[in-house]
Amino acid sequence: MKNINPIVKLEFVGEKYYMNTDVIGEKDGFVIRLAKADDVVNYYEQNYCPLDKEVARLTGCKEEFSKEEVVSFFLKSLEENDRYFFLIIAPDGDIIGESVINEIDWDLRRANFRIGLYRQAERGKGIGTWATEITRDFAFEKLKLHRLELDVYSFNPRAETVYLKAGFKREGVLRDAIMDGAKYADDILMSILEDEWRILKMQR
């Protein structure tokens, strides 16, 4: 087992530590909570049958996944000690997205962040901004991280705007590092440090 921060990992279940609560955010009926094994069927059926092509484009993944692939990935993610896998739940109970802290290095106190909303109808409503800020706060308040980082493609300016609003800063560009159809595009690197997050919280 990897080095686990004993301050924030409060409850040991099987081979993974959990916080003493699964829910990290609630707003207007929307909830962000840790994923559970019981969610896997709904996760697949509500979001991968079929997967929105724009989601595939903006995340760099393929457009079609088998049920076996999704189930295997989902359940494996729950077992990883360096990942917090949160689901974004709509007021009607449907899973509409995910917000993930992964690749956690407890010694360096750094991690990667990614987020995705699966349904086009839910985009542009501020849900992604809210979920990003809630997950960011969890990373620094509960996990006591020093650095949270991400990458975003240059053809996804809406996401970059969300990250900038949440306090992430551009720190580099991998030029022509990916393909958008038949064209090259940039991969933009961004991060936020704990001191920057503290200043941001004091200003709001």
Where are these regions (language model features)?
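Glycine-rich acetyl-CoA-binding "A-motif" of GNAT/NAT acetyltransferases
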Residues: 94-97, 158, 184
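A short, well-structured alpha-helix characteristic of acyl/acetyltransferase catalytic modules
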Residues: 2-67, 71, 196-204
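Short glycine/proline-centered loop/turn elements that form peptide/ligand docking sites
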Residues: 128, 132, 155-159, 176-181
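Conserved GNAT acetyl-CoA-binding A-motif
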Residues: 141-151
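Conserved acetyl-CoA-binding loop-helix of GNAT-fold acetyltransferases
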Residues: 118, 124-138, 160-165
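Conserved active-site tyrosine of GNAT-family acetyltransferases
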Residues: 163, 168, 190
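Conserved catalytic-core motifs of GNAT/GCN5-like acyltransferases
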Residues: 149-152, 169-187
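Acetyl-CoA-dependent GNAT
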Residues: 63-121, 193-194
